[in-house]
Amino acid sequence: AIYVLFSDPWPKKRHHKNRIIQGRFLSDVARHAPAGVPLYFRTDHSGYFSAALEIVQAHPDWRVDPEAPWPFELPTVFQQRAESFQSIVALRR
C-alpha cells in the first residue's frame, strides 16, 4: 500500500506545481506497484483534495474506489490538529 498523509498542500497557486499528487508522481508509483495496490491519500485542505481527486480520477493507471474502507483509524498528530479531513482511496489498475 502507498500512503500520502497530510502532505504539504502548497496553497498558493504559483506553488501548486510542488504538490506531491501530480500525474508524474502517480505514473512513477504505478510503474513500481502491481495491479490492485491501494493508494491512500488524506488531507485537511479542501482545495488540495479537489485538485488531487481530479488528477487521480483522470490518471489511466489508478481507479478511485469511493466504497473502499480506510485501513486504520489511529489518529495521526496532524489528524488530531485538523478540524476536518478528506480521503481518497485509489487502486492500481
Tell where the protein language model's regions lie, with residue ranges.
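A short SAM/SAH-binding and catalytic strip from SAM-dependent methyltransferases
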Residues: 1-20
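Short, low-complexity, polar/charged sequence segments that are solvent-exposed and flexible
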Residues: 2, 21-24, 59-61
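Short strand-turn motif at the edge of the Rossmann-like AdoMet-binding core
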Residues: 6-7, 42-46
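Solvent-exposed, flexible loop/coil residues
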Residues: 14, 24-25, 66, 82
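Short, glycine/charged-rich beta-strand-loop motifs at protein surfaces that mediate ligand recognition
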Residues: 15-16, 40-42
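A short glycine-rich, Lys/Arg-flanked "PGG" loop and its adjoining helix->strand segment in the class I
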Residues: 19-38
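Class I S-adenosyl-L-methionine
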Residues: 48-93
